């Protein structure tokens, strides 16, 4: 353990943590325009067709994001809201799209975990 004099001579270094979602530039979300919507296959033990899209953000950066949930309404030139969060079995996909905002509609048939997929609460009419 250093003495007080040693700390005065050479203070402790502050360890800076690097952001994992660098394209957002310290913002929680960013708006973007879809350039290409396509499917890709995941890494080795998994097998599927994952829906992804290449997006140009409003700050000029280009990213690849994951479209979560079943079915989507994205086309070229659609507006999307991008948040951080990588997809473990898709290399290079470090971002998710927020469902239920702009042109990416909510998952319509969702009953559980609705907040993650932009689905409003359905209340049956009182008779």
UniProtKB/Swiss-Prot annotation:
Q: Does the keyword Mitochondrion apply?
A: yes
The gene from which this protein is expressed is RPS12
Swiss-Prot/TrEMBL keywords: Mitochondrion, Ribonucleoprotein, Ribosomal protein
Q: What is this protein called?
A: Small ribosomal subunit protein uS12m
A Pfam family (short name) is: Ribosom_S12_S23
Q: Name one GO biological process term.
A: translation
Cysteine-cysteine disulfides: none
**Keyword flag Ribosomal protein:** yes
Source organism per entry reads Chondrus crispus (Carrageen Irish moss)
Biological role: Protein S12 is involved in the translation initiation step.
Major site of localization recorded for this protein:
mitochondrion
Enumerate the InterPro entries for this protein.
Answer: NA-bd_OB-fold, Ribosomal_uS12, Ribosomal_uS12_bac
Q: Which family does it belong to?
A: Belongs to the universal ribosomal protein uS12 family.
Instruction: State the PANTHER family in the record.
Output: 30S RIBOSOMAL PROTEIN S12 FAMILY MEMBER
Any single GO molecular-function term of the entry would be: structural constituent of ribosome
The record's Gene Ontology cellular component field reads: mitochondrion; small ribosomal subunit
Subcellular location, record wording: Mitochondrion
């Amino acid at each position: 353990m250093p003495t007080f004099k040693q700390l005065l001579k050479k203070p402790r270094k502050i360890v800076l943590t690097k952001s994992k979602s660098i394209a957002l530039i310290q913002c929680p979300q960013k708006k973007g325009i879809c350039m290409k919507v396509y499917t890709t296959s995941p890494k080795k033990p998994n097998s599927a067709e994952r829906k992804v899209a290449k997006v140009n953000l409003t700050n000029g950066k280009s990213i690849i994001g994951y479209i979560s949930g079943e079915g989507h309404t994205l086309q070229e030139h659609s507006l999307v809201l991008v948040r951080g969060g990588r997809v473990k079995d898709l290399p290079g996909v470090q971002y998710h799209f927020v469902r239920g905002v702009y042109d990416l509609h909510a998952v319509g048939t969702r009953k559980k975990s609705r907040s993650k997929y932009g689905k409003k609460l359905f209340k049956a009419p009182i008779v």
